[in-house]
Amino acid sequence: LEGESFCIAGPDTEGSNTTAIITSFCPKLPKTKPSNLRLKVLLDCSGSMAGDSMKQARVALKHLFKQLNEEDSFAYTRFGSSIDRVTKKMTMAYSERIQTLLSTIDKTEADLGGTELGMAMTDVFNMNANGKARNSPELTDSADVLLITDGDVWNIENILASARISGHRVYTIGVGSAPAESLLRELAKDTGGSCEFVTPREDMRSAVDRMLTRMRSPQAVRFAIKWHATEEKHKNHEWASTLPPQLIDGETVHLFARLPAKTEKPPVLICKTLVKEVEQEVSSAKPTSITWDNEGIVARLCAAAQIGELTECKADTKLAQSLAMKYQLVTQHTNLFLLHERAE
């Protein structure tokens, strides 16, 4: 089943003749020559990273730096309540430098106090990248930032505002059992990066590989989806989850939608790229059939996904609460009371 796309749908009994649908796409994208990197690595070395989180980070960093080639440039910064620029500025990834850096990774400890992320992000953004931006002949200070952290932080709005105007794409990996999930997702989303989370003791190297593949992607692939509602007058969906800003070849994306009419054809994910300012379709993916569910589970899962997006974007909290009540879901907007009646 590897590389296959799937689709499950069912009636939304809470709606008016609507259909809830969940689909998983695994598009095959054309092979392209990878771009060189300008990468700023930012590692959380606050006290909360001690133990398994730091062990995961050491393994991941060694793996990451070994993937760099001599055409790449990079910087490596540790932070906590203070900032430690391991490399004082952006530098080319020559083999001698990488070997010297690798020899220091095992000595990396969670010894820098609290989690002053805002200060560290500002310092990294201000570091001269000294190169040309992707698809641009102009010199720029922008680069990709890879942030590895486990801690919750304060001053979130200022951090997000700084990231948005920095010109950097921020990629985030949250480690441990309680990372600052909403902030890490927003940092990635608002800057065109991506976000992943790894559980305690999970191997982080796969997440690093996916991040590097995205960073090296030389062209932006745009995505569109055809939901195939049966009735012509109901071509548009009532609601659908947001398409990801970027996919890599072989990666699976899960999407949810609520259609105003029944669908008999599986949805199709269309991948396009911009060639000389003209969009050209380069790939598509679709399930071979639709599996039908009549228990109402699909509708509730779609509602949960919609609530998740509303909550993440801090959008319509009243709508999120209304959906949670309507579909009887336990969320941060609702409460569940369990009453146990004892026998007399």
What are these regions (language model features)?
Residues 11, 15, 33-50, 59-62, ...:
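Short, charged loop segments at secondary-structure junctions
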Residues 50-55, 314:
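Ordered, soluble secondary-structure elements with a strong preference for glycine-centered loop motifs
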Residues 75, 173-175, 198-201, 208, ...:
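A generic structural motif
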Residues 84-88, 182, 207, 343:
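Short Asp/Glu-rich motifs
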Residues 162, 178-218, 222, 327, ...:
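Von Willebrand factor A/integrin I-like adhesion domains
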